[in-house]
């Protein structure tokens, strides 16, 4: 990833979380008190704003196709290809509201970010531990059963091959859909890999089912 884009992304990422630390604490207190309406209100306001801000300050222009095809009034399992670290803010900036994500355990160790991710409903997974992976999938299944949509990158890691390709899909995302009966919404992200290779203004595209 270009050094300038990396610096800009991390300055904005942590700068936003520090400036809005009071919002984080308010959301955590609401969660502890069982006020889920307030938690969702704060998360739905700030996480998309944070995601769009990252794209703006790093010179990323996003086009989205197919939002009208997302099933309404039901929890979905969003299944996307994984090309770069930008995939998460790209998705969070595109959907009508943010959703929990099956994320690698390393992200749980990042201060402030881990707390926002927990409020969002993210589930952290140890990819090299089968039992822990099963527990994580069960947790994600419970979230979908509760009526909330969830995002999974079924390759399990970023795909580093040619643009247009994809890694081997793991079965976890589809098991969640089968167990819950939730519709699977495929998401194709193109152009995200290029964000790692230059400092120029870049375009990326996100396609939902047609």
Language-model segments: which ranges?
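Catalytic core of membrane glycerolipid acyltransferases/transacylases, capturing the structured
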Residues: 20-33, 40-44, 56-58, 72-130
């Amino acid at each position: 990833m270009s050094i300038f884009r990396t610096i800009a992304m991390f300055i904005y990422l942590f700068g936003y979380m520090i400036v809005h630390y009071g919002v984080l604490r308010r959301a955590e207190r609401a969660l502890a008190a069982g006020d889920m309406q307030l938690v969702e209100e704060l998360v739905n306001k700030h996480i998309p704003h944070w995601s769009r801000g990252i794209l703006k300050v790093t010179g990323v222009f996003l086009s989205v196709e197919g939002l009208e095809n997302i099933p309404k009034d039901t929890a979905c399992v969003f299944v996307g290809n994984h090309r770069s670290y930008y995939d998460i803010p790209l998705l969070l900036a595109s959907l009508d509201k943010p959703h929990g994500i099956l994320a690698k355990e390393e992200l749980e160790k990042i201060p402030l970010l881990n707390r926002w991710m927990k409020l969002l409903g993210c589930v952290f997974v140890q990819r090299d531990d089968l039992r822990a992976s099963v527990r994580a999938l069960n947790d994600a299944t419970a979230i979908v059963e509760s009526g909330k949509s969830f995002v999974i990158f079924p390759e399990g890691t970023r795909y580093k091959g040619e643009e247009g390709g994809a890694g081997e899909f793991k079965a976890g995302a589809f098991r969640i859909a089968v167990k819950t009966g939730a519709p699977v919404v495929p998401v194709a992200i193109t152009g995200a890999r290029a964000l790692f290779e230059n400092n120029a203004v870049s375009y990326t595209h996100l396609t939902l089912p047609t």
